[in-house]
Design a protein with these regions (language model features):
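Conserved alpha/beta catalytic core and glycan-binding cleft of carbohydrate-active enzymes
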Residues: 1-88, 121, 127, 131, ...
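Short, contiguous acidic/charged loop-to-helix segments that flank catalytic cores in large enzymes
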Residues: 45-52, 97-107
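Active-site His/acidic residue clusters
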Residues: 86-98
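Catalytic cores of secreted or luminal carbohydrate-active enzymes
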Residues: 99-128
């Protein structure tokens, strides 16, 4: 866990651009993969446990995908791809690790992405500009949990996540 730079508010607010003009993402050819950062920079309880890293990737994916607006997933993000972005050059070919799907922790991450994307597809009213959105996703909410609350068309949901490395 790293509170620095963890404010997710820019996924939804802070732009004069019309809704849907900005694409939210957590990794790209310019942004290091979050799974690689967990492996190389994480606290020992995270970087030494594939299960912990994949659970954190699932949490990050849920928060990315549950904020309204268009999203981009980068090459194999849904599998917890933890190869450094400079492998073969930033925009070069990356090794494909289909065997990741044979690992139960990575398969669970993949399935979590599928579930979240299905939720988005089945409930489009939550993810358009008319939804009522409340985000508690800044760096100040690092220790007490981040939340996303969305209401639309008489329905609502709340996503709560502990990004800290403790169980608090």
């Amino acid at each position: 866990g790293n509170a620095s730079g963890s404010d997710l508010g820019g996924l939804w607010t802070g732009s004069a651009m019309p809704f849907g003009s900005l694409v939210g993402f957590s990794e790209s050819h310019d942004e290091e993969r979050t799974a690689y950062k967990s492996l190389s920079e994480g606290v020992s309880s995270v970087k030494n446990s594939l299960k912990a890293r994949m659970q954190r990737e699932s949490l990050c994916g849920a928060f990315l995908l549950c904020v309204p607006g268009p999203k981009m997933l980068w090459q194999f993000q849904e599998l917890g791809y933890d190869v450094i972005i400079d492998e073969g050059g930033r925009t070069g070919r990356k090794p494909v690790h289909w065997e990741y799907l044979d690992d139960p922790d990575r398969k669970r991450l993949h399935d979590d992405y599928r579930t979240i994307l299905k939720f988005r597809n089945d409930n489009p009213e939550f993810f358009d500009e008319s939804a009522s959105v409340s985000l508690k996703v800044g760096t100040s909410s690092w220790n007490n949990g981040k939340t996303i609350s969305i209401s639309a068309s008489g329905k609502s949901f709340i996503l709560v996540g502990n990004f800290n490395t403790s169980d608090s």
